[in-house]
Amino acid sequence: MINSPRVCIQVQSVYIEAQSSPDNERYVFAYTVTIRNLGRAPVQLLGRYWLITNGNGRETEVQGEGVVGVQPLIAPGEEYQYTSGAIIETPLGTMQGHYEMIDENGVPFSIDIPVFRLAVPTLIH
C-alpha cells in the first residue's frame, strides 16, 4: 500500500488458471486496484503508466488515458475500484507504475503504484 497526503493505493493480484497456458508460456493474471481519496477535496485520475516485468527480466511498458475506459472523479472519503488484467510469459513477474491525477484546482500530481507480484500460487510457499 502506498499513501500520499491525498490518495491511498492498494492492489491485489490473482492467477487466472482457466485462461492460462503454461505450455505456451502464457500466464494470465487479474489485478484489482482500490484508490482511496483521503483528502478533503475531489481528485481525478487522468492517466496511468505500468511497468510489467516477467520472471526473465523482460519489461513491457503500458500507458494511456484513464483506467478501464474511464477517468474517475473520486470524492473526499470515497474510493474507486477496478479490475484489469496482465499476460506474461513466465509464472512469476511484477507490476508497478503510477497514476497521473489532478486536484480540485486542476493541478497535476502523480501517485506511485507499489510493486506487486504476479505469481502462480504453487510457486509461493
Swiss-Prot record:
* SUPFAM superfamilies assigned to the protein according to its UniProt record, in alphabetical order: ApaG-like (SSF110069)
Q: Which Gene3D superfamilies match?
A: ApaG domain
List, alphabetically, the PROSITE patterns matched.
APAG
Supply the InterPro entries for this chain.
Answer: ApaG_domain (IPR007474), ApaG_sf (IPR036767), Uncharacterised_ApaG (IPR023065)
One annotated GO biological process: error-free translesion synthesis
**Which branch of life, at top level?**
Bacteria
Q: Which residues belong to any copy of the ApaG domain?
A: 1-125
What PANTHER family does its record include? F-BOX ONLY PROTEIN 3 (PTHR14289), POLYMERASE DELTA-INTERACTING PROTEIN 2 (PTHR14289:SF16)
> In its UniProt entry, what is this protein called?
Protein ApaG
The species this protein belongs to is: Escherichia coli O1:K1 / APEC
- Mind giving the lineage of the organism this protein is from? Bacteria, Pseudomonadati, Pseudomonadota, Gammaproteobacteria, Enterobacterales
